[in-house]
Amino acid sequence: EKQRISKILEKTEIDFSEKQDKTEDEEKRQELIKNLVISADTFIAYRPSFRLHTIIAGYPWFLDWGRDSLISFEGLLLKTKKYELAKEVLLTMVRDIKYGLVPNGYSGFDNRPLYNSVDASLLLFEQIQKYINYTGDYEFVEKNIYDKLEKIIENYIKGIDIDNNNIYLDSDFLISSGTENTQNTWMDAKVNGIAVTPRNGKAVEIN
């Protein structure tokens, strides 16, 4: 276990070497960052059904969620220089794209992809750009992902209707999504099938 942790810390961009002239605050900060790097590694999990790695949204009951996985992608995999795992996670994210939508998650009962997210596909673009910035690996993106990015753009412009998501680019070039009881943003709580905070239309963080 000590060897595994040492390897995790060695790969990061952060200097964890022992220095004589460190202040007490610097030592505390370094120890905090070290603990965060080690803890972050526990959220990277292998999905046997995909034969690929993914990012778990939260223990003990959350599986991988497209939105959460992509938001945490840079910190968990790029800052820590886990570039091979980063490629696997990107392949996991694009594996079940349907009509331009990255799955927001998978059913815990039958592993069925769930498409209740308007922003996961948009976050994918952002994280792929970051992957390229860190690695310069255009070849991987061009070979495995580029055509899927094109399809996302085409479908958002044309309009998407899966499970009443009703996502489309409006005439004012803002993205509209959902119905009164469709929850496609991070505020996705429902009680008895009714949205607690209806956010259909043009949510500010999506545009």
Regions found by a protein language model. Name each.
Residues E1-N207:
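Acidic, mature catalytic/reactive cores of soluble proteins
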